[in-house]
Amino acid sequence: GGELDYVRSSIGIDRIYDLEKEVADKTINQLLNFNDDEWAEKGKKYIKQIQNINTNHKSFFTDKMPHNFMMCGLIHKMLPQAKIVFCYRDAMNNCFSLYKNTFGTSGHGYSYDQTKLSKHYNLHVKLMKHWKNVLGDKIFLLKNESLIDDQKGVTAKLLKHCGLEWEDQCLEFYKTQRDVRTISIRQVRNPINKKSLGLWKNYADSLSEMQKSLKEFS
């Protein structure tokens, strides 16, 4: 798996963020007009794209495209058996991590401005609360800080949600030899730790806008 753009392309929409109102309204109307058979076909199209890259013929894969959070309802419509996992962090820990990194032209331009970043994060929190209310147990909530405090316990609950058996290797993910393409590659290659918790406090005087505006997911 990885950060795949297959949800959007399978549904057939150009993009899901930074849309002009007219385009957004047209996209929403388009989505509302799909019937169950059409959603099922889009699900098959998604699986077909996955099969093209699943050279090891694995039974399970992950799609961690950041913007997928906007489409949880659509994902459920076209892939009703999909397991949705919402990974989130303390708001300041999360947004400081975004603010200090460079994403190039990957669709995260909001992350370079504290006001825009706070607005984006808060809208993301509001939307995820909506999806959780609508989809209920279809969405598994995984808070980073909880995973750090109890890696084994939280991992066991995650595996149960996904219908997977326990494997001790789950606690040693950093030993994997597979290719990893993510801005957090250094974290992936190391055990879970608390190094990034509260790191933003070292720069608190320069982060007043975020401290004032951010809302927690709860």
Protein language model annotation of sequence segments:
Residues 2, 60-65, 83-88, 141-146, ...:
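Short beta-strand segments
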Residues 5-7, 89-94, 147-149:
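Conserved nucleotide-binding/hydrolysis micro-motifs of P-loop NTPases
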Residues 1-79, 87-88:
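Phosphate-binding active sites in nucleotide-utilizing proteins
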Residues 70-73, 96, 152:
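Short N-terminal helix/helix-N-cap motif within the alpha/beta-hydrolase-1
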Residues 79-80, 135:
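Short, structured coil segments at secondary-structure junctions
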Residues 14-15, 23, 30-58, 98-141, ...:
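PAPS-dependent sulfotransferases, especially Golgi type II membrane carbohydrate sulfotransferases
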Residues 70, 80-83, 159, 163:
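Hydrophobic/aromatic-lined pockets within catalytic cores
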Residues 75-79, 85, 89-109:
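Conserved P-loop NTPase nucleotide-binding/switch module
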